[in-house]
Amino acid sequence: MRHLITISQPAIPQDVTNKDGHKAKKQLRCKGIYPFLWMFFFAAALPLQATQPIEVTRFHKSDMATTGIVNIMPHDPTLRNTLEYQRYTASIARNLTRIGFQVTDNPQQAEYTMMYDVMRGTHYRDNGQTPPRDTRPHGGISLGGGYGGGGGFGGGGVGWGGGGSGISIGGGGGGGRGFGGGGGGISAGISVPVGNGYHTSNKVETILTAQLSRRDTHQAIWEGRARTEAKSNKAESTPDIAVDRLATAMFGQFPGESGETEKVK
């Protein structure tokens, strides 16, 4: 069944001469242009689907090198040969090559090691009891991930996306100062909601963490973290595209301003 939509068009006044010889206004209707104008203004009023910006934070030593031979590997070495992490490694390698590094698959030939991790998750909310802008799991069990324990990237009492009254277990290890303290190794983080009343949002969050260290001394000289989120039905939420965007933002303007967080569109 078809529906006929009638669009009422405003009349255009035009001077005409009446039978008494005086000028009068005649209402003419333009049948061809107004529907197109209406469609144009309607399309212009539609909201633009802008890509979400990426938050990037970096820390580095002042005397760090910006070129050299580097070997890239995930924090969990068992994931190195998986198809998923091979794609992530390729994205990081492409960006490191662009800024001047030479990438090798042989760790023994490398001067540096780039260790990275990818974390993905869906926000949880507790039916209105959580503040509107706080999408962290409340009352969940949070296994902290990121750089180092004791307040690293999502580690040590906070956990990635953790908070509230949940149980938090810090991840990572090593000494020195990393992101927010801790430093050293990288560990993944997961959040598991418990209790009743939770429901997921339609946004997927992706976090990429990376650490560049000297192979001979294992001393970290650069660390970076990038995060973004996108609606689950958008291409930007898929793992490949999300990680590629994060890597491009993280290694743009390398090594970046140490200790500052910036938003990259």
From Swiss-Prot:
Highest rank taxon of the organism: Bacteria
UniProt cross-references to InterPro entries, sorted A to Z: DUF4136
A Pfam family it matches: DUF4136
Positions of region (Disordered): 122-145
Listed name of the protein: Uncharacterized protein ZMO1243
